[in-house]
Amino acid sequence: MKRIAFLSAACLLMLGTACQRGPVAPVATQSKVVEDGGTGPYKVLMLEDPSLEAHTIFAPQNLAPFGKKNPLPVLVWGNGACTNSPWEHYKFLNEIASHGFLVIATGYIPMEEKPYRGPMSTSAQQIESIDWAIAQNADKNSPYYGRIDVENIAAAGMSCGGLQTLDNATDPRLKTIMICNSGLFINPGTAVPNMPMPSKDRLQEITVPVIYILGGPEDIAYENGMDDFHRLVKVPAFAANYPVGHGGTYRQEHGGEFTVPALGWLQWQLKGDKEAAKLFQGADCGLVNREGWTVEKNDLID
């Protein structure tokens, strides 16, 4: 009896994850397996959780492998056009999640691959995603209890979603930010109404590493994004360009080529992966040797 009691106490001390047997599934009101769950080591489910309205979650189908020794870092995502659904980006986000990340996208789950026509999303929805992840990690009744790495959270977004990310960039819970096909407007008068519009001064308030992933000079956000990058002199900053224009490669199989720097950056910044760091560090970094990519970085990257 004493031995049983001791083992039970040990399980509690290890956040209840190490002693559980069998798979642990996330809660979902509706869900979909995208591209066989991704190519990473953890098959993913795209789902809607009843406790987080107007958000889409990409989570491992089985949460059992995650716990104190292998927690899930978090990526919160804002969509292009500030659309309230990740319908253009779900393949890209699904692939990232399959490599051991909890991805929470702003907006309603895209059960069908068709444009979302509802109202725009808001910057606050990214903050809701962060709040939810932290609360789930602390909730003993949640399947995510003790499985989320709340010390390693990234915010990212594409186009208008990138502006939402920059709007939230000073949140102290963020470890890094990733800006895709976006940048603060050099001329705010050219912006679409209702877009978040922080001034360029916001860049000097950022205290975490930043990566810009852009579509080359044909990308309508190229000048704004590169201008941002050149202003970031106090934090590690990296700019990667792939010549596909503003739309990126998100809708291609497994998110296409944009997944390479995005995943590598998150593995480096949120998991401390030294192999992933080689994509970005050094004069002969891995990404510069990958066909099609051009890169710039400041001295703080190396």
Show which residues each predicted segment covers:
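Hydrolases whose catalytic domains are alpha/beta-hydrolase-1, hotdog thioesterase
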Residues: 164-168
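N-terminal cap/lid segment of alpha/beta-hydrolase-fold proteins
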Residues: 23-70
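The feature captures the conserved acid-bearing segment of alpha/beta-hydrolase catalytic domains
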Residues: 175-252
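Short beta-strand element of the alpha/beta-hydrolase
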Residues: 69-80
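C-terminal motif of bacterial Sec signal peptides marking the signal peptidase cleavage site
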Residues: 15-18
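Alpha/beta-hydrolase-fold serine-hydrolase catalytic core, especially in secreted/extracellular enzymes
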Residues: 235, 244-247, 252-302
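Gly/Ser-rich "nucleophile elbow"/oxyanion-hole loop immediately N-terminal to the catalytic nucleophile
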Residues: 64-71, 115-163
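Short amphipathic alpha-helix adjacent to the substrate-entry channel of hydrolases
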Residues: 87-106
